[in-house]
Amino acid sequence: MAQITTTDANEFSSSAEFTPMRGFSNCHLQTMLPRLFRRQVKFTPYWQRLELPDGDFVDLAWSEDPAQAKHKPRLVVFHGLEGSLNSPYAHGLVEAAQKRGWLGVVMHFRGCSGEPNRMHRIYHSGETEDASWFLRWLQREFGHAPTAAVGYSLGGDMLACLLAKEGNDLPVDAAVIVSAPFMLEACSYHMEKGFSRVYQRYLLNLLKANAARKLAAYPGTLPINLAQLKSVRRIREFDDLITARIHGYADAIDYYRQCSAMPMLNRIAKPTLIIHAKDDPFMDHQVIPKPESLPPQVEYQLTEHGGHVGFIGGTLLHPQMWLESRIPDWLTTYLEAKSC
């Protein structure tokens, strides 16, 4: 059985425990505050385009030239829905990795680096092939070094699926999954209720804008036209008309059920830390796994507060991005011990 950790919001003694910023424990404030405190990338990324076997590409944003840092421990970041290096959690963690002497990299999902992808496909929660190919390319190109993968939100569900599918064959030493929607169908309905509809509208606008750019650059590479795209009003509708159809699923519900990581979590073989907040406004309670469903190598941490990929502590004058210490601290055992 997995190790289950619950965090008491009234205690704080190490990075393993989360205490929200005083007066700012509200889930929506926690979710939105990172965009105030982590507006800009504070390092100069080294960009690289990786051509994929099917003729498409993904863009990589490194903390430094990987050819000059191939000996360093590696931390790979998989972002959330319509995320990128510019997402506060992504560049914040890469910077934290850099400060520890590790090589950090964000693998942008297809079409998420600012340029539309070429092929008749996009990315989704269960699309593990690109991440798997990249991790193996990383090892072939730069040799063996301790490697960890971190997935946020959609990228977290994807990473959980990948870990479950490949078991010990996946070339990573450990993984961390944050705010992942392990039950996609339940979360899709949750996003259509109450204040969560604000987040749905925001994400849907990003999805539609990205799809419109793809249609303009590569006409016919999506199963709907621009007029149909403009009429989409819900993420579930977007997934029904585009995500499911372009990737061979019957509809959005079929996609959600086949790509939800929850039923696969018991197959994870690598050391993995999963972090959720009870008050995550993107999530339904069904994303919280039962202890008996998790294998011993999975540690599950459920905090009272934190919102969706928020977890802001400290004070307004001195904010603390808890994930930027919690994740590297937990991974140190697997990255630095192996690199000695």
Language-model-detected regions and their locations in the chain:
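N-terminal cap/lid segment of alpha/beta-hydrolase-fold proteins
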Residues: 26-68, 308, 312-318
